[in-house]
Amino acid sequence: LPSSGEGDILSPVIGPIASAAESHAPGKRRVEKLVMRYRLSRLVVALVVAACAVSGCATNAQYMGAERLAHGLVVSLDGVGGYNWGPQWLRDGLNQAGVRSAIYIFDWGHGPAGMFLADLMDESGNREQARELARMVENYQRYYPGRPVYLIGHSGGAGIVVFALEAMKSTTQVDGVFLLAPALDPDRNLAPALAHVRQNVYVTHSPADVALMGLGTSTFGTMDRKHTVSAGLVGFRIPTNLSAADARQYAKLRQAEWKPDLLSKGNLGGHMSWTTSAFAREYIAPIVLGRPASPISQA
């Protein structure tokens, strides 16, 4: 690895990947090629900037070590504003539940925390961030084939996740996706995104989330630039004009509406209620761990 200032920036991401590759690859040459590719890839810069911007390099690096990378990958995205509180709470819950995969907080925001409207309205910039996420997943799967990959997107971050799925190569699939209070048009055709998911896409929505997912997106628009209530309020509606192939993709969609029994888990039905550590521990982790006991897996 380079010893320059650039190396200091890249090492939190390159180091764990190279170390893990060394233990799994047949020879040193493959490791050297891996490191060189990551030096040249601007994806690395995007990943490390995301790691350092809010959470701090050490915090994200703690969940991106070689052992975790060898288990699998969970990528979590916050909503507009770039504070990344929700992904940190979710990460804590997943870790408490025994998830040993790498857990990466992908910071897709447009600058200083609090740029809510910029994050929401810049569709071209958001799609560029989504392409970066898609390439990140594809690079991970290239060097860790067969490991499980899960994507979690809350609110605006759910839009980035859907855009990323749509931007993936035709042969790329992730294992599962969680769209928590998605700030997307409820009539959006999800079939192109669903085609890149091997198992299921889980959607959570709440009729109590009316301020942000109702009034907010009706006024300022959804991530896909429709001025309407969002799927985070009412869920996704299945289009009526689907082809047979697209209709088969919709068999992967699982939608869970907020219910009063979630109160015992600290979920009051508000916008941030889907991002608590308790929700991650009780509802998301069982699916990531391959234990389909989570109520949302039966939706």
Q: Where on the chain are the PLM-derived regions?
A:
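Bacterial N-terminal signal peptides that target proteins for export
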Residues: K33-V44
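C-terminal motif of bacterial Sec signal peptides marking the signal peptidase cleavage site
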Residues: V54-G56
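Serine-dependent carboxylesterase/thioesterase catalytic core
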Residues: A58, V80, N84-V234
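Short beta-strand element of the alpha/beta-hydrolase
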Residues: G72-D78
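C-terminal catalytic-base region of ester-bond hydrolases, centering on the histidine
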Residues: L212-A299
